[in-house]
Amino acid sequence: MRIGIALYSFSGFAESALRGIAAYARPNRPWTFDHGNQTLSGVNRLLSRNPDGILISVSDPEVCERLQAAHVPIVNMHYADALPRAGRVSNDDAAIGVLAAKHFLSRGHKRFAYYAETGEPIDGRLRGFREELARSRHSCEVFHGGPYNDLAEYEARYEQPLQRWLQGLPKPIGVFCAHDHFAWRVAESCQGADISVPAEVSIVGVDNDTAICALADPPLSSVQTGSLRIGYEAAKLLDQMMTGEPLSGANILVPPVRVITRRSSDAMAAADTLVATALTHMRTHLHDTKGICLLYTSPSPRD
């Protein structure tokens, strides 16, 4: 069988999802894969190869219209429900938001913010974040600024507003970002505005894109999504659809795995930065009595 695949090539999600697809397909299924992109021309190319099924992550209306007219079994891995007659396997975005909120709350945060793309359809992440915060009687600020994949537009229209927004936020604060790309932008903006991360602004992204997380300064904490399982479940669902099972419109939500903690959020929140440093040290060395004693006897930098 010939399977068309169209995912963002340079993303942590795509890499893991592809490994999940391979894990399902390779043991005993004679599948041949054609890899393209999610543009209209890319999808037309995939369709020209007469695929038996398509695995894709797409929300563009024109591309979705073309796919709907193709009468080929399709599983969409995009968070937007843009292909109603296709199968869908995607992140449980509300659960991602809940996990991020719990991460900040566990570090003593009482102020929170959310940053996503302008017109971002991932409202589930914000909804889960808000609902979990509301259980502790907290709310959050929201900033929508710039497209996911257009750096030029972001720099021209949103870079300065983002920096001003961060400067105006009450601190310390936990900022949850819809993607790791946005978390990197927040880290850069904080650096440009002389805002300390994580003492003043603590940052958590989504996808655990290891390259982006490592390149940011400081390295980014991120919600590790179930993208490996998404790829596996998407391939399994497509297999069932291709064998005639009536599963069009099936919707499978995959929960996140955990928050991978790196330096961008690895601190306890406190209004006084010296206190925050002390709390973070004590949490890190909870079972190290020598470390606590050394902290207690160390002179204050204010002396």
Q: Where are each of the predicted segments found?
A:
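Bacterial carbohydrate/catabolite-sensing allosteric modules
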Residues: M1-G53, V63-C293
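Conserved small/polar residues in nucleotide/adenosyl-binding loops
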Residues: Y296-D303
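Short, structured active-site "lid" loops
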Residues: I56
